[in-house]
Curated annotation (Swiss-Prot):
Superkingdom in the source lineage: Eukaryota
Name of the protein in question: Ubiquitin thioesterase zranb1-B
Species in which this protein is naturally found: Xenopus laevis (African clawed frog)
Lineage: Eukaryota, Metazoa, Chordata, Craniata, Vertebrata
GO molecular-function terms, A-Z: cysteine-type deubiquitinase activity; K63-linked polyubiquitin modification-dependent protein binding; zinc ion binding
Catalytic activity from the UniProt record: Thiol-dependent hydrolysis of ester, thioester, amide, peptide and isopeptide bonds formed by the C-terminal Gly of ubiquitin (a 76-residue protein attached to proteins as an intracellular targeting signal)
Length: 701
């Protein structure tokens, strides 16, 4: 007893050292020079007021005689028989079978278990106690504020410690947002338990007449302690819960954290978190597991089996639904030529990178040296119907095809073009991230994705090196477009510069969505026109119109000389924030199709007629025209005829001719398509024959 009374406690690890030790035996910290208030004087003995003052020294918070009324201790005999709760240390009456504060079950004391010394010694003090001693728990709270409790092992560390000295767990301030949500809850339980112990260490009179909380924060913390203590049930269960959460976090990978952040982003309306998960290649149809729901710790928002789509519907995130629903629909098995032949695809990418050059002169824009147009092979029609259906399911985007054909007559609305002139357009499937525009442009030309961002780099470099040229066109076009809708306003030059800087930044960020200006620049890089067939309005998940899309129209390389460009355009489709390549199927190339069209081509050339009017026979808009080039429809039609090979069909439809040749096509692209098609040709023997005559025909062949 005497030796324990003269030991000194380390201010870092609270270990009790012998008085002759100048350093802590456990953590090697130097012995403090001043007095430190600890709980040790209250343990294992019955102190008097004089000894407490000698050992503790001056308290950190000591109210004067006017702060608290001087009262004598009462009910000492009754309080001495109270039992202390094992969870919150609250002193309950002997007849209580549950804790009044946290409702935890009273634990039966074993014969070998000794009573708690932290409270019994103080409860046996018979005489009156000074108010400074009575409210000394405030001093202890001050000391506790200088420490932080480890959420993994519940060890109390010094405030200066960056990590737990026992388990090396980092401080809560260094953890991620999702980890903080869990550790805050754990630390709140521990802090409330500590505060309850400090209250139990006070005098019997203070225990008997506890004053109500002095602030709203204290009452909120008490209410939270009651709820959490009732949920945990016991300290052992709480420690097991912390251990389980730590195991779950250790198993988490980067993709898992991105998925959880995306779920939180849907709930909080943060689209960037969802886009970050999409860009990383995450599965949009992924469901929340029980461990992930436990880690998120928000039962009101998350449930097992929920996907990002479920959360978007529940919290009415219409903008996210428009993107996510397209994503989920595309998780069917896809098999495009670029996926079947990775070696050839890499060679094609190297060919594209080698064909990118920069024009010398004032307009130093980048351009491609090769003219390549991708078309579906005509050999597809030789496959059995079941194999054809499988092929189209794996190479086409059925949702985009349906939206452009059935929901709105945007493509293939002319029976003359689709049937008699063999100019039916097919929407190819591609990635649905922010690179879909660049992917669709390369698919319409070379049949592959812009996986290495070769086209994006050329786009950004062209915008940077030719910024003055494109900026003047963009500014003039935006001003005219706003005035055409009756929006008469003027912007300061600083505002125009800020908007232009944002357009430049989008071009340099892989995965960032692109705008009309980028399509205009891509037309200059390809040196050929780009025709976009797209929906006219943005719509919500419920079908409500939100605004104009402004993407549909013709984009001409107006800043090049006409002699430097090709007149064969490519076609793209736009639906709900997504671009798709629109390609045709090879045809025989004969027959003078189209009134007034003198093709004069051999049988190897495929001619696709792309309409320059919509289903209402209105001329498509030509984007980024200057004030001198703007005019009525006749003047714009004349401009289109100058930049493209145009003709009028017998049905009176103004069309542009897209010409492609298998012999003139790049050999690597032809080889890639043939290898892809061979995979479907091998499926043919597995199909059932309809009758015996077909079997005989196959044998004759």
């Amino acid at each position: 007893m005497t030796e324990d009374g003269i030991k000194w406690a380390c201010e870092y690890c609270t270990f009790e050292n012998w008085p002759s030790a100048i350093k802590c035996t456990m953590c090697r910290a130097p012995r403090p020079s001043g007095a430190i208030i600890t709980e040790e004087p209250f343990k294992n003995r019955t102190p008097d007021v004089g000894s407490m003052e000698r050992e503790i020294g001056s308290p950190l918070i000591c109210p004067d005689s006017s702060a608290r009324p001087r009262v004598k201790s009462s009910y000492s005999m009754e309080t001495s028989s109270k039992w202390s709760c094992q969870i919150c240390t609250y002193l309950n009456w002997p007849r209580a079978i549950r804790c009044t504060q946290c409702l935890s079950q009273r634990r039966t004391r074993s014969p070998t278990e000794s009573p708690q010394s932290s409270g019994s010694g103080l409860r046996s003090i018979p005489g009156p106690i000074d108010p400074c001693e009575e409210y000394n728990d405030r001093n202890k709270l001050n000391i506790k504020g200088q420490h932080w409790t480890c959420s993994a092992c519940t060890y109390e560390n010094c405030a200066k410690a960056k990590k737990c000295v026992v388990c090396d767990h980092p401080t809560p301030n260094n953890m991620d947002a999702i980890e903080l949500a869990n550790t805050d809850e754990a630390s709140s339980i521990i802090n409330e338990q500590d505060r309850a112990r400090w209250r139990g260490g006070c005098s019997s009179s203070n225990s008997q007449r506890r004053s109500p909380p002095t602030s709203k924060r204290d009452s909120d913390m008490d209410f939270q302690r009651i709820e959490l203590a009732g949920a945990v049930g016991s300290k052992e269960e709480f420690e097991l819960d912390l251990k389980k959460l730590k195991q779950i976090k250790n198993r988490m990978r980067k993709t898992d954290w991105l998925f959880l952040n995306a779920c939180v982003g849907v709930v909080e309306g943060d689209l960037s978190a969802v886009e970050a998960y999409k860009t990383s290649g995450g599965d949009i149809a992924r469901q929340l597991s029980a461990d992930e729901v436990r880690l998120l710790n928000r039962p009101s928002a998350f449930d097992v089996g929920y996907t990002l789509v479920h959360l978007s519907i529940r919290f009415q995130r219409q903008d996210m639904l428009a993107i996510l629903l397209t994503e989920v629909a595309q998780h069917a098995a896809k098999c495009i030529p670029a996926m079947v032949c990775p070696e050839l695809t890499e060679q094609i990418r190297r060919e594209i990178a080698a064909s990118v050059h920069q024009r010398k002169g004032d307009f130093a824009c980048y351009f491609l040296t090769d003219l390549v147009t991708f078309t579906l092979p005509a050999d597809i029609e030789d496959l059995p119907p079941t194999v054809q259906e499988k092929l189209f399911d794996e190479v086409l985007d059925r949702d985009v095809q349906k939206e452009l054909e059935e929901e709105s007559p945007i493509i293939n609305w002319s029976l003359e073009l689709g049937t008699r002139l063999d100019s039916r357009l097919y929407a190819l499937w591609n990635r649905t991230a922010g690179d879909c525009l660049l992917d669709s442009v390369l698919q319409a030309t070379w049949g592959i994705y812009d996986k290495d961002s070769v086209l994006r780099k050329a786009l950004h470099d062209s915008l940077r090196d030719c910024s003055h040229w494109f900026y003047s066109r963009w500014k003039e076009w935006e001003s005219w477009y706003s005035q055409s809708f009756g929006l008469h306003f003027s912007l300061r030059e600083e505002q125009w510069q800020e908007d232009w800087a944002f357009i430049l930044s989008l071009a340099s960020q892989p995965g960032a969505s692109l705008e009309q200006t980028h399509i205009f620049v891509l037309a200059h890089i390809l040196r050929r026109p780009i025709i976009v067939y797209g929906v006219k309005y943005y719509k919500s998940f419920r079908g409500e119109t939100l605004g104009y899309t402004r993407f549909q129209g013709v984009y001409l390389p107006l800043l090049w000389e006409q002699s430097f460009c090709w007149k064969s355009p490519i076609a793209l489709g736009y639906t709900r924030g997504h671009f798709s390549a629109l390609v045709a199927m090879e045809n025989d190339g004969f027959d003078n199709r189209g009134a007034g069209a003198n093709l004069n081509t051999d049988d190897d050339v495929t001619v696709t007629f792309l309409p320059l009017v919509d289903s209402e026979r209105k001329l498509l808009h030509v984007h980024f025209l200057s004030a001198q080039e703007l005019g009525n429809e006749d003047q714009q039609e004349k401009l289109l005829r100058e930049w493209m090979d145009c003709c009028v069909t017998e049905g009176g439809v103004l069309v542009a001719m897209q010409k492609s040749s298998r012999r003139r096509n790049h050999p690597l692209v032809t080889q890639m398509v043939e290898k892809w098609l061979d995979g479907y040709r091998q499926i043919r023997p597995c199909t059932a024959l309809s009758d015996g005559e077909e079997d005989e025909d196959d044998e004759d062949e």
